[in-house]
Amino acid sequence: MAENLRFCGPALIADETMLHNVIQMITDIITKQHPCQLEFGPEEETAEAGEETSEFDWVVVDTALDVVSGMAAALGQSFAELWKVFEKTILRYASSGEALERATSVGVLAECINGMGAAVTPFTGTFLKLLLHRLNDEDPQTRSNAAYAVGRLVEHSQSDAEMLKEYPTILSRLEQCLSMNVSRLQDNATGCVSRMILRSREHVPTKEVLPVLVNILPLKNDFEENEPLYRMICQMYKWEDATIRELTPQLLPVFQAVLTGDEDQLEDERRAELIELVKWLNQMQAGAAPWVEQL
């Protein structure tokens, strides 16, 4: 159902009765009140089930949370009202003592932020407080998902005061993430920094940050983050940024790897923009990137 919601849109839950039933079912599952999650046997049998029962419970909850993120993708900004139904439970999981529960719920939160778009603005303060904490999480996957979620919040929230105030803290915590090559952490941290620069480059020390990003390129795990990354890089050239120009010799091999490698590394629009940039660089310095003429 989650995938159908993402690809087919809100038609699946357009009927009010259907929507109500789905919400009720999902709420029952994520609060562990659905009949399939209740134990009716003797206490001894329940105790013997132990870890196996716990793992089964989480698989069910995880599946329901996936439907929540699917609803966010399908409903867009109108999901903001529905978020209030799920908020308490999802945020509780995001502060769980179990790493898997934290990682999953923070990932769902990221997808909900992306789905809500600008409608996420009223929740900015609440989300930031949680996500800044999770950016220091001991679990790499939770930290990675938090970096992605913060990046999406930077992209969509219209609360400049709340977002820009936390830029120094976010950057400080992302600095550690960028040095950890685990669980897509570098990729999501790179995407987050890129979105921060695109939103307000004046609040990012790009002279120090850009060389760090370039040293870990090209991204190897999460190609979705190539979109904000190369949009940011192209924009920095348009802004005639001195630091990005100085980094051109290091960037050209990265551009070549991305443009001549697997096609799924870039969406068509970003690929076209990057090719245009490389052609311009090749004109400015004849022979700097002769391979671009074959694209």
Residue ranges and their predicted role:
Residues 1-295:
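Karyopherin-beta/Importin-beta family HEAT-repeat alpha-solenoid scaffold
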